[in-house]
C-alpha cells in the first residue's frame, strides 16, 4: 500500500464526528506523502471508517473496483473481518505499512443476474426472501441439472468471506476464502411429501452456475438482498448466480489471518 498514495475515505454513520477524529491521522498521512481525496474516482486506495457493514457499503458505492486496494478502519471495540486497523491505532498501522508488515488478499465476489435485465455483485451474500408472511416456491438448478424444489422463507448464497455472516446463522459452513466457491443455505424450508430439499447448506465450485426459478404462485415479489442492501424489483422470475471473475483486493495485517479472525470472533 506504500505505493498507493491517493486515498479516499468512506464513512458510514456519524461522519462529522469521525472526520473530526480522523484529522490528526490525515495530517500524519499527508506528512508521509499520501494525498487525501474528496472523491473516489482518482483514488488507488479506498479506506472505510466504521465497521464491516461500512466496508461492504464502501465496496458497493465505489463500484467493486479492481484497480485499487480496499482497507477497513474499525471504530468499534475490536478489529473485524474486513477491518484490520483501528481508529485509535492508525499511527501504528502506518508504521506497519511502511515496514511492509501488511499483505494484499484477494476476496471473491458473486455475480447475480435477475431476469436477464438486472446484474450486480456481492462481496458477502445474495439473498432471496419472501416479502410477505407466506412461503414461496423456487426450483433450484445447478448448471443444467434440475436439483430440487424449495418451499420456505428464502435462500442465501454466500461467498467464502460471507460464510461467517448471515450464512453462519443458518448453520452454514465457514469456508476458507482461498477456496473459490459459493454456498447455498436455506431459510426455514418446508419439507413434506410434496416439497423436498437437501435440508442442509451445499457448496458449489467456481465453475458452477446456480439458477433459481420462482414459481408464479402469487408470491413472486421477493426481497432481494445484496450484502446489506435491499434491491427493489417489482417481479422476479429467475435469478442466475455464479462466482465472478471480479475480485476485491483488501489490505490485511500479516499477523491477522482469516482463521485468526474466526477464532477471535467465535471461540
Curated annotation (Swiss-Prot):
Belongs to the NAD kinase family. One of its GO terms (molecular function) is metal ion binding. The gene is nadK2. GO terms for cellular component: cytoplasm. Its EC number is 2.7.1.23. Pfam families: NAD_kinase_C. This is NAD kinase 2. PANTHER family: NAD KINASE (PTHR20275), NAD KINASE 2 (PTHR20275:SF9). It comes from the Bacteria. The keyword Transmembrane helix does not apply. Involved in the regulation of the intracellular balance of NAD and NADP, and is a key enzyme in the biosynthesis of NADP. Catalyzes specifically the phosphorylation on 2'-hydroxyl of the adenosine moiety of NAD to yield NADP. HAMAP family: NAD_kinase. InterPro entries: ATP-NAD_kinase_N, ATP-NAD_kinase_PpnK-typ_C, NAD/diacylglycerol_kinase_sf, NADK. Signal peptide: none annotated. Its main location: cytoplasm. The active site is at residue 52. GO terms for biological process: NAD metabolic process; NADP biosynthetic process. Its cofactor is a divalent metal cation. It comes from Bacillus cereus (strain ATCC 14579 / DSM 31 / CCUG 7414 / JCM 2152 / NBRC 15305 / NCIMB 9373 / NCTC 2599 / NRRL B-3711). It is found in: Cytoplasm. NAD(+) binds at residues 52-53, 124-125, 151, 153, 164-169, 188. Keywords: ATP-binding, Cytoplasm, Kinase, NAD, NADP, Nucleotide-binding, Transferase. It catalyses: NAD(+) + ATP = ADP + NADP(+) + H(+).
Amino acid at each position: 500500500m506504500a505505493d498507493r498514495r491517493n486515498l479516499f475515505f468512506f464513512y458510514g454513520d456519524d461522519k462529522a464526528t469521525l472526520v473530526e477524529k480522523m484529522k490528526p491521522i490525515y495530517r500524519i498521512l499527508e506528512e508521509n506523502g499520501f494525498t487525501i481525496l474528496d472523491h473516489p474516482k482518482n483514488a488507488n486506495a479506498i479506506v472505510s471508517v466504521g465497521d464491516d457493514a461500512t466496508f461492504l457499503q464502501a465496496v458497493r458505492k465505489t463500484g467493486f473496483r479492481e484497480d485499487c486496494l480496499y482497507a477497513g478502519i474499525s471504530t468499534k471495540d475490536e478489529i473485524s473481518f474486513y477491518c484490520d486497523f483501528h481508529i485509535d491505532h492508525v499511527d501504528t498501522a502506518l508504521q506497519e505499512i511502511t515496514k511492509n508488515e501488511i499483505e494484499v488478499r484477494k476476496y471473491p465476489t458473486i455475480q447475480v443476474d435477475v431476469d436477464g435485465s438486472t446484474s450486480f455483485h456481492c462481496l458477502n451474500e445474495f439473498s432471496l426472501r419472501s416479502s410477505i408472511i407466506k412461503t414461496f416456491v423456487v426450483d433450484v438448478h445447478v448448471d443444467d441439472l434440475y436439483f430440487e424444489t424449495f418451499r420456505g422463507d428464502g435462500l442465501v448464497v454466500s461467498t467464502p468471506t460471507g460464510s461467517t455472516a448471515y450464512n453462519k446463522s443458518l448453520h452454514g459452513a465457514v469456508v476458507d476464502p482461498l477456496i473459490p466457491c459459493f454456498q447455498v443455505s436455506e431459510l426455514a424450508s418446508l419439507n413434506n411429501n410434496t416439497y423436498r430439499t437437501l435440508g442442509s447448506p451445499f457448496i458449489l465450485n467456481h465453475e458452477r452456475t446456480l439458477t433459481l426459478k420462482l414459481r408464479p404462485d402469487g408470491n413472486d415479489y421477493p426481497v432481494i438482498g445484496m450484502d446489506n442492501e435491499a434491491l427493489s424489483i417489482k417481479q422476479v422470475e429467475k435469478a442466475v448466480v455464479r462466482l465472478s471473475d471480479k475480485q476485491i483486493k483488501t489490505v490485511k495485517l500479516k499477523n491477522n489471518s482469516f482463521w485468526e479472525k474466526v477464532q477471535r470472533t467465535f471461540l
